[in-house]
Swiss-Prot record:
The gene is clpS. Pfam families: ClpS. This is ATP-dependent Clp protease adapter protein ClpS. SUPFAM superfamilies: ClpS-like. GO terms for biological process: protein catabolic process; proteolysis. It comes from Nautilia profundicola (strain ATCC BAA-1463 / DSM 18972 / AmH). Binds to the N-terminal domain of the chaperone ClpA.
Length: 97
């Protein structure tokens, strides 16, 4: 999924495509759980996690981070697994940047 090739000192570097991970709002997942996901899965600090959670609640979705495809996919899967285990319908999606 490379998007850009750069040649430096006769070494070809292929830059991966990047994907924005978004959290989607629902009527059941608690603020505390979303904040915990943001801190543990996405490594956000408390203030960042609260701000993102409020944006998800107000606007219906919010960007959490930008990652190469494989990393974005793993973070989404981890979010869905933890949400299911806790009994919440929290969803995350990705879109190409």
């Amino acid at each position: 999924m490379p998007t850009k090739t750069v040649v430096e000192n006769d070494v070809e570097i292929i830059m991966p495509k990047l994907y924005k991970v978004m959290l989607l709002n629902d009527d059941y997942t608690t603020f505390d759980f979303v904040i915990e996901i943001l801190k543990t899965v996405f490594h956000k600090n408390e203030e960042e996690a609260i701000n993102i959670t409020l944006k998800v609640d107000r606007e219906g979705s919010a960007a959490v981070g930008v990652y190469p495809y494989e990393i974005a996919q793993v973070k989404i899967e981890k979010t869905h697994t933890l949400a299911r285990q806790a009994g919440y319908p929290l969803r995350a999606v990705m879109e190409e940047v």
